[in-house]
Amino acid sequence: MVHYAHSRDIDVEDAINAEQVDDQIARVVNPLALAFERSADLGATFRALMADMLRQFLGTHKSIRLLMKNREENPSAVADAMSLTREQIEKVYVVALLLENPEQWTERYLKDEWRKAYERHLLDVDERSGLTRYDDFLKEHADGLENERKGLGISDEEKEFVEWRYRNPPGTPRPPHLKAASKTIANFPMPAEVIDEVSDPQLKDALRRWQREYGYFSGYSHSGFRKLMPGFMEGNMRLTTSEKEKVVETEYAQSIMISYLATGIACTEAATRALPRGPSGGAPASKVADADLLVKVSDLWDLLDRTSLVGRALYEMRMRHVLPPKFGAP
């Protein structure tokens, strides 16, 4: 199922105070990130990565709010706010995959980052090795990447595969001895691929529904016509100021709500997932969040369910099944 058929509407007069919601979101994200950092029986790299990822939702959201706030000075910036919202949507898939298998996907995530850095280094060598002022930089960068490679446990074959892929155009037959390396240092999965890796059928459905938002907002990151619309509106003198503001309210202001939803989904999955503990996950699984924090997450969804149809769809499809029940709920 990739949609939710609504039988209850929201109250369109039930407006939100964005500053208050920002504060409510922060009171969920910050203690949850801290809870990961303090969970010493989780892998050190995984818990640090999760804490940073959760906090980044707040950082990106602040940028979205700033772009929307300054739209009178820079009308085209509202389209950039939508591009950042797409980033928020995508981070949900990263969080979901990291939680699916912390050890496996943390390693893959870090290998993917090293691969990108190494490919960039190879390009720098190709383009700048003839410039004397880059001699020291290229050598020091190569040494740093090599030390990082060894620290991450990236094999010689994986390094060779990155070099081979960099040197050869797509479609070039891969050397047989690099077959295994091509899988272990492959790109970190995109959202559609993440869905295939998720084991929980209910979460799969919610992520499929969420992918509809990802596809729509991707039009802003891929320079579709919607990205150009703010400039078009500014140059179209037939639109009144109130008509332009109506477009902002119906199209671009949703960037703020979708950003709230992205943060809410990620925090819900991170707070409610029972994670394997101890060396190699040998200890009983347990949640990172305590009861008080779970109540805060549930209170956040009470707001998101009440004020957004997208939020209500996601709440009914997934969140209500993993969060503490609302008071008086059926």
Residue map of PLM features:
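Long, hydrophobic/aromatic-enriched structural stretches that serve as scaffold segments
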Residues: 35-100
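Long, hydrophobic, well-ordered secondary-structure blocks that form the structural core
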Residues: 75-132
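Secondary-shell segments that build the walls of catalytic and ion/ligand-binding clefts
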Residues: 1-48, 115-330
